[in-house]
Structures are given as C-alpha cells and as structure tokens.
Regions:
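Sec-dependent bacterial lipoprotein signal peptides
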Residues: 1-22
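Short amphipathic alpha-helices and their capping/turn segments at secondary-structure boundaries
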Residues: 57-72, 136-155, 200-214, 311
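Surface-exposed cleft-lining segments at the edges of enzyme active sites
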Residues: 181-196, 240-244
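Catalytic His-Asp segment of secreted/periplasmic serine-dependent ester chemistry enzymes
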Residues: 221-316
C-alpha cells in the first residue's frame, strides 16, 4: 500500500468527483456512493480475479459442496453493499435500498442452505455499524446487533461515507453557481486514519459477539479510472481526476489496513474490477443516470464481481 502522498495544495473537488468517491447522501436514494476502490492500483495491476467474465459480465459460480450448508451469514455495509436501484429490491429493505441480487444475496445463493441476514443500508458510515443510523426520518439499530453467537460469516464494507466533508462538498457543489469548498490534506489523512481505526473496532465488536465467525472486509471497486481523461459520466480531467483516483485508492488502502491489523480477511474487489471503472469500454459502475443502479454505484456486473471474490475467499 502506498502512503498518501502530498496533493499539490487542497483537494478541491467537483460534483462528479465527489459523487463517484462518496456522494454520502442520507436520504435513502442510494446516492451515498461509498466511494472507492478495493486497493492500491499500482500494487494490484497484475492481480487475478476469481470472476470468470462472460458477455454479460462476471459469472458467479455455485458451490455444490456442503462446506457452507446451514451457515449464518451477516452482511454489513453501506449502499455499495445494499445496491439500491439494482432490481428487484428486498421486500423489507425500505429506504436502505437493499437488492435481492446484491453481492451478499448472490453469495448466500451460491452456498445452498445458508441463512443470510443482510443489514446493509444506504448512507451508512462505519460508526453506524456500532451505533444507530438516522436515515430519512427513521432510526436503524447498530448493524453489529445482527451478529449473534451462532453467526458463521460476516462481511463488512464501509468508509466511503465517513468523510463528512464529502457530503458537504457534494451538496454544495450540486447547486448551480455554487463555490465548492476544499478539503485539505490534513483532513483527508485524518479521515483515512479514522476509517482504519473504526473498522478495526467493528471487527473487534464482531469477534466479541461471534468469536468463531469468519470476518471479511470487502473492499470497494474501481470507480475512478487511471489516466488523465474523464468522460461524460465523470467530467473532470488532469490533476482533479488524479486526485480522485488517489482518494479512490487510499480509501481502499485504509480498509485493507484495518483487515490486516485486526486479523480479518481482505477481499480485493479493486483488482477484480480493473478495466471496469467509469469511462472504460465496459464499466461496472453506473454513470449519472438512475438506470440499473443508483448513480455512481455498482451495476449488476459490479455486484457479481464482488460476490465472486467473496465466494473465492470463503473457499480459500
């Protein structure tokens, strides 16, 4: 993992950049974009993916063994886990926007006989895994409350909504003629450090409740492309695009550090989604329209890619 390098002045960010990294909405619309990618791009460019690609995207294999039969699987996370807008929705998901074909559902479906408890919710921060979440006038209990002594597997993925500054920036920059605030390096570094610290605390709380459970931190996919050119769905370029990519990578590094420090497994979705960021020929991240997924969130193919990596990790 490369360290967060100096960023040539403040991280001045525009609307598309912030939406892609962490749109941080708390209105349940799914625009909370847990921004980020699953690892440092430079380190993982040669990594292999567990997903076999088809013309429709990655395939999710089924597991015919009894290794995971009767297991209880708890999924915790934000909208990148819940998958708002990826139809059909879970009947009880409400404003959290959980999909019946998000990666936790696909993983549970691949392991016949397992029980899924999906408490992921749009807008969730890492703090919401341990404390209650306020969303659209409703209060949701701490996600960790779903973990009990009989839980066998826990996946968790948060951090993209932890930067309160991103929510402020996205909200203000969306207004016509508004001046976008800036996020300085110290704020970014402190926020990334908190992501790691808070995720370590969550993993510890999970282990207290279910000492025997397998805990996996699921990294974010590649959202921002490498290079210096944006596109219609990400209309920034040059230095600004580079800063977005750097934050994309560093957020995931923070997730990976937490997994390593707490002795949990890390699922590298960043490597699995190489070549499928925004502006690519075959993006697995939705653009600005609410089509097939919430804006700037994983498309069904992105959910399948994450599921394939989780399945591979559990079978490893």
């Amino acid at each position: 993992m490369r360290p967060l390098r100096p960023l040539l002045g403040p991280l001045a960010t525009g609307t598309a950049l912030l939406l892609a990294l962490a749109a941080c909405s708390d209105d349940g619309s799914g625009s909370d974009g847990a921004g980020g990618a699953g690892g440092a791009g430079g380190e993982r460019s040669g990594a292999t993916s567990a997903a076999e690609e088809t013309p429709e995207g990655p395939a999710v294999r089924t597991d015919d063994s009894d290794d995971h039969a009767d297991q209880v699987y708890v999924a915790m996370g934000d909208s990148y886990t819940a998958a708002p807008g990826v139809d059909p929705a879970q009947g009880d998901s409400g404003v959290c926007g959980r999909s019946q074909v998000n990666y936790p559902s696909l993983v549970a479906g691949a392991f016949g006989g397992s029980t899924l408890v999906d408490v992921s919710c749009s807008g969730a921060t890492t703090a919401d895994l341990l404390g209650s979440q306020q969303l659209a006038g409703q209060t949701f209990p701490p996600q960790v409350d779903a973990v009990t002594a009989d839980t066998d597997v826990v996946t968790l993925s948060t951090g993209g909504n932890d930067f309160g500054a991103f929510g402020v920036l996205a909200g203000q920059c969306e207004q016509p003629g508004a001046t976008c605030p800036t996020l300085d390096l110290a704020t970014a570094q402190a926020g990334l450090a908190r992501v790691t610290t808070d995720l370590v605390a969550v993993i510890g709380a999970v282990r207290e409740r279910a000492p025997q459970a397998r805990v996996l931190v699921v990294g974010y996919p590649q959202v921002v492309p490498p290079g210096a050119e944006g596109c219609a769905d990400l209309p920034v370029d040059g230095e600004l695009l580079g800063l977005a990519r750097l934050l994309n990578e560093e957020l995931v590094n923070a997730q990976q550090r937490a997994a390593e420090q707490a002795g949990a497994d890390y699922v590298d979705v960043f490597a699995a989604t190489e070549g499928h960021a925004l502006c690519s020929d075959d993006p697995w991240i939705n653009g600005s329209d609410f089509v097939e997924a919430a804006p700037y969130h994983p498309l069904p193919a992105g959910q399948r890619a994450a599921a394939a990596e989780v399945i591979s990790a559990l079978d490893g």
